[in-house]
Each structure stands twice: as C-alpha cells, then as structure tokens.
Design a protein with these regions (language model features):
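Acidic-glycine-rich active-site phosphate/pyrophosphate-binding loop
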Residues: 1-15, 54-64, 111-113, 167-178
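Internal, well-ordered alpha-helical segments in soluble enzyme and binding-protein domains
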Residues: 5, 31, 35-39, 47, ...
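Short glycine-enriched loops at secondary-structure junctions
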Residues: 7, 103-107, 164
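Claisen-condensing/thiolase-fold acyl-transfer catalytic domains that form or cleave C-C bonds
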Residues: 11, 18, 23-44, 135, ...
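Short coil/turn connectors at secondary-structure junctions
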Residues: 17-19, 45-51, 72-73, 81-82, ...
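Short beta-strand segments
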Residues: 25, 50-57, 79, 87, ...
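Phosphate-binding/catalytic loop of phosphoryl-transfer enzymes
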Residues: 44-54, 59-72, 224-226
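Condensing-enzyme catalytic core mediating Claisen C-C bond formation in acyl metabolism
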Residues: 63-136, 140-143, 221, 233-235
Length: 235
C-alpha cells in the first residue's frame, strides 16, 4: 500500500505536518512487537516524543480459494482487525512498560508461511509444520528471556493466537502457561494477523494486570519465518 496507512492516520488525527511517520510492512502476523520495539527506539532518541503504534490488517483483501488445505484453512482462519497504543518515555501513575525485546529469524523456513502471486492475486502458503515451527521458535525465545539477569519472573504469557493447532503446540511446549486470553481472541475474532497479540493483551488485562511481582511476556511470530517477544510489566 502506497502511501502507507500512517499517512491516512495522521490526516484523520490532524497531526502536525512535520510529524514523523513510519510504516513497517512485510512482517506478517509478528509485526506488532517489532513496531513496539521501533517505538522504544524513537523514544530513546527523542525522550519528549509521544508515539502512537498502530497494527492494522485487512486480510480479506487477500481472499483466495482453491483446494489446497493450507488455502482453505487460511480462508477460514484469517480476519480483519486493528489495534493501537500510545507510548511515552516516562509512564504516568499505574503505567506499564515494554522492555527486554528479542527476535529470532529462521530464513530456512521462509517458504512455510508466505504470500505468493497466483492469477494476479495474493495466495497464502501455510505449511502444516507451522504450529511446531512456532512452538520451537517461541521456546527458544522464552529460554533466552528466562536467562536474563535482574528482571522480574514471567507470570503470564500472551501469545499471538495464530490458530487452534498453534496454541495447542505452544501450550504443549510451555505447559505452565495456559493461553486462555489468546484462545478467547481466536474464538471471537479469528487470526487478525499482527493486531491479534494486542487483542490478547487487552483480553488478559480484563482478568488483571502485571505488577511488581512479575512481568507478562508477549510473543508473536509470522512471515520470515520469525518470532518476536518482549516483557510487559508495571513501570
């Protein structure tokens, strides 16, 4: 999409004409957490800035049908959605912070999850190995997060609700962390791609919020194949 979504968002919000706009594309379902990481970098360079992060996907624009099982699953699974958050370098009372960002790239598995062009349309490639691939990548990132020194323990995992089999594989890999919020989002909204993990975060916060006794751990994954994670906790 050119110009990007940020151009239209800035116009509708009436932002000043010299506001810095940046569109991150090509990251698929995993994009929300890298966007938060980009916001962290902007705030580090400009401590007085206010950053709006928007994750928006119109999966219905890539609707395609044939008899391939991956295509059929994609047509049943994916949906449209958007989520947004506002960030500052200094949180207010009762605020939260994202930190401890990490990423894992697995380019050897790039072709297991991607778009291709077919008859002038976007056709989703969804390999049956994706659930186990996601679980393996998430396990590696979580191991690295657990090894970090001087951080709070992880009390809850908020995962991208990529599908039933994906969530089953994640819970099998990390059985101490049930993914109830992610399952509710999948049930109610389907897989909205990048906004989904933020929907799961909002859903989890209906049950409670992280505090000084422990962080939540957000994780998403998608095209590349790549996985991304960060800690979310009380400031």
């Amino acid at each position: 999409m050119c110009p990007g979504v940020s151009s239209y968002v800035a116009e509708q919000l009436g932002l000043r004409t010299n506001a810095f706009l940046q569109d991150l594309v090509g990251l698929g379902c995993g994009a929300a957490i890298p966007t938060l990481r980009a916001a962290q970098a902007v705030l580090a360079a400009n401590p007085n800035a206010v950053v709006a992060c928007v994750a928006v996907e119109v999966c219905s624009a890539a609707f395609y049908l044939d008899d391939d099982p991956g295509v059929i699953i994609s047509a049943c699974l994916f949906s449209d959605g958007a989520a947004a958050s506002i960030w500052r370098s200094t949180p207010g009372p009762g605020g939260w912070r994202c930190h401890g960002f990490d990423t894992l790239h697995l380019p050897a598995d790039r072709d297991r999850l991607r778009f291709e062009q077919r008859d002038g349309k976007l056709r989703n490639l969804l390999d049956p190995a994706v659930p186990q691939l996601a679980a393996g990548a998430v396990s590696r990132l979580f191991g690295a997060a657990q090894a970090q020194a001087g951080v709070r323990p992880v009390r809850r995992i908020i995962a991208h609700p990529g599908g039933r089999d994906v969530l089953n594989a994640l819970e099998a890999a990390l059985p101490e962390y049930p993914l109830a919020a992610s399952r509710r989002v999948l049930r109610d909204f389907g897989n909205m791609s990048s906004p989904s993990v933020l929907f799961a975060l909002a859903e989890a916060m209906r049950d409670g919020q992280p505090d000084e006794n422990g962080d939540w751990w957000l994780v998403s994954f998608g095209a590349g194949f790549s996985a991304h994670a960060c800690r979310f906790g009380a400031a």
